[in-house]
Amino acid sequence: MMILQVNQLSKSFGADTILNNIKLEVRNRDRIAIVGRNGAGKSTLLKIIAGQLSYEKGEIIKPKDITMGYLAQHTGLDSKLTIKEELLTVFDHLKAMEKEMRAMEEKMAAADPGELESIMKTYDRLQQEFKDKGGYQYEADVRSVLHGLGFSHFDDSTQVQSLSGGQKTRLALGKLLLTQPDLLILDEPTNHLDIDTLTWLEHYLQGYSGAILIVSHDRYFLDKVVNQVYEVSRAESKKYHGNYSAYLDQKAAQYEKDLKMYEKQQDEIAKLQDFVDRNLARASTTKRAQSRRKQLERMDVMSKPLGDEKSANFHFDITKQSGNEVLRVQDLTISYENQPPLLTEVSFMLTRGESAALVGPNGIGKSTLLKTLIDTLKPDQGTISYGSNVSVGYYDQEQAELTSSKRVLDELWDEYPGLPEKEIRTCLGNFLFSGDDVLKPVHSLSGGEKARLALAKLMLQKANFLILDEPTNHLDLDSKEVLENALIDYPGTLLFVSHDRYFINRIATRVLELSSSHIEEYLGDYDYYTEKKTEQLELEKMNQQEETDKTPATVKSDSKRSYEEEKEWKKKERQRLRRIEEIETTVQTIEENISRNDELLCDPEVYQDHEKVQAIHADNEKLNQELESLLSEWEELSTEED
């Protein structure tokens, strides 16, 4: 079913054309990513589709009964309600129905036989409608979203207005997810999410019953969630089938194909023109030359494929090599003034050439640890020891090292006054600051431009140990790839914090998982880390199961169970645990089937066959309904108490 059509849409800001003849189609259960460079017009397009911006030309066609939900970047809720109360406002209509049902129940209790039948019919209709709209499920849905987005540990009395900006944005996302619109429009939904929350959101969106339109710079997320990609480049859009990786492959293959066709035509043109030039003046060949010239005139000459827009181009060098041991942290305890310790007795070591990713939930203290390592914060106790010849370069995710009042050129030149202006300008050019861009004040730059400027300063430092705090924040997808390639070739040592799992996978040789009291080390990339975490969880589950089997029967608070009661309780407990295992196995199979179906939808032979696509969507719909029912049963069984 068609949910939305965008036809020949154009948008300008002043003399600048941002979008030109954009075409986009959204069908039910489509998962569409809009990608492109920073400033390409992705967010502008989402705002137009959501009805928050006007446009000059084109049309947007949407059936009247289709609902849309839009989450803009940096959107946050501000309310005096508690976190849970705010999310429950989504279901005010169900609470009103529930109240009406309670009133009718009281009426039925007091009604005479003549009225009762009529009231019961009305009550049955209302109860069925309440059930169909999720009346018996919505509180569980709220709990699930609160848990998934990392709010389960908050006190029930926590008010929305007391949350940080990032937490308010997360809550706004949760509220939007609960509304279940037919078309979910998300602009950078992965901002402010830690890795656990990102994983939960991926699973949630994979099973979402409506269509999704996303702008995101998280490649791992896009690979997991989307099945179509629209690239916005040079104000125009182009559609690709499959996830983000498939889009990259198709784009590269199309460019190579177009380039070969262009070069072949250019060779043909050159040969024809050469024949005309050599033979036009000769009487014996004039007619043939004129024929070739007409052939040239009739030819539809191809434009040279443009390929990608200009990319940043940089690399990180070092002035001198460090000793083998680069950093040793021993029993480090860190706290803020008048606060309990954030980190306690943390220890780890880095050697030359390692690339270590520091991961952990939001608020655990990752950035605090990095700031302590560079001496911006002082530890309460413990030691930080650097090896011989270690020089440290630090990248701050908030770009606090930049001076907002300076010009871009001066920001670098003041730091390295010994370098000639030409070299400074060349360096800035490598980071896409050209011409008058270098004369802009720093405060006028976008987040992505500030990130590139901070990286330019870091490059000139030539330190042999780089400590990076969220270096991919604000960078577009292309700039992330350039940064990755530069860091892969970097001859020094790396310690970095990042929520970008694709980035971690490419860069990390070791993952350090930070908790409040220690660091757990994993010798591999992100995929290795997640594999080991899964193994650990499965092992813990097995151990808990064994403990449960060994544990003596629970004693009732008022009296001991009789032998028969004990026997019956054990029987039911075994049945409950067996059913949990059955559900978990079935859920895994269903999720694999959904994933397999999503992969099929990326196959050209399938997505070009409309009947096959409809059949797969119908199968996924059925699988998702079954999955929802099983997960609901699993939750009930898991929380069941004697």
UniProtKB/Swiss-Prot annotation:
Gene3D superfamilies: P-loop containing nucleotide triphosphate hydrolases (3.40.50.300), Valyl-tRNA synthetase, C-terminal domain (1.10.287.380)
Sorted UniProt keywords: ATP-binding, Nucleotide-binding, Repeat
Protein residues bound to ATP 1: G36, R37, N38, G39, A40, G41, K42, S43
Residue numbers binding ATP 2: G360, P361, N362, G363, I364, G365, K366, S367
Compositionally biased tracts (Basic and acidic residues): 541-550, 557-567
Region called Disordered, residue ranges: 541-567
Family matches, as CDD domains: ABCF_EF-3 (cd03221)
InterPro entries in the cross-refs: AAA+_ATPase, ABC_tran_C, ABC_tran_Xtn, ABC_transporter-like_ATP-bd, ABC_transporter-like_CS, ABCF_ATPase, P-loop_NTPase, Val-tRNA_synth_C_sf
SUPFAM superfamilies assigned: P-loop containing nucleoside triphosphate hydrolases (SSF52540)
Protein name per Swiss-Prot or TrEMBL: Putative ATP-binding protein YdiF
Lineage, highest ranks first: Bacteria, Bacillati, Bacillota, Bacilli, Bacillales
